[in-house]
């Protein structure tokens, strides 16, 4: 009998995110908000909405609603791209900086706690295995297109 690896990985991501989400409750950010802010911060500046949606792994229409909410909170701005007027570039505002620092601190601290007892070499090996699984899955998608 094969182990349900896909389900195990999905559950791991779900419970890890839920733990971070619980710890970020004092910031009054939804999971969608902090995941989006975290990705904007760690991607090169001025990403387009399309690039950000791909990085997060969601559809662009879903992202637009989240970006609207973050813009209303004064945490991001969107600017029309000079090269493609249909595209919008996303920038963090100054008021987002302390929130980003708090989010990153919680994520980093939680990661350290979750990985307690696992050697850096084991973490590196796991990262390589996950990257290989992703590469295989993407290749399968391309072959079916």
From Swiss-Prot:
Belongs to the SlyA family. GO terms for molecular function: DNA binding; DNA-binding transcription factor activity. NCBIfam families: PRK03573.1. This is Transcriptional regulator SlyA. PROSITE patterns: HTH_MARR_1, HTH_MARR_2. Disulfide bonds: none annotated. It comes from Pectobacterium atrosepticum (strain SCRI 1043 / ATCC BAA-672). It comes from the Bacteria. Pfam families: MarR (PF01047). Residues 49-72 bind DNA. Transcription regulator that can specifically activate or repress expression of target genes. SMART domains: HTH_MARR. PANTHER family: TRANSCRIPTIONAL REGULATOR SLYA, TRANSCRIPTIONAL REGULATOR, MARR FAMILY. InterPro entries: HTH_MarR-typ (IPR000835), MarR/SlyA-like (IPR039422), Tscrpt_reg_MarR-type_CS (IPR023187), Tscrpt_reg_SlyA (IPR023071), WH-like_DNA-bd_sf (IPR036388), WH_DNA-bd_sf (IPR036390). Homodimer. Keywords: Activator, DNA-binding, Repressor, Transcription, Transcription regulation. Residues 2-135 form the HTH marR-type domain. One of its GO terms (biological process) is response to stress.
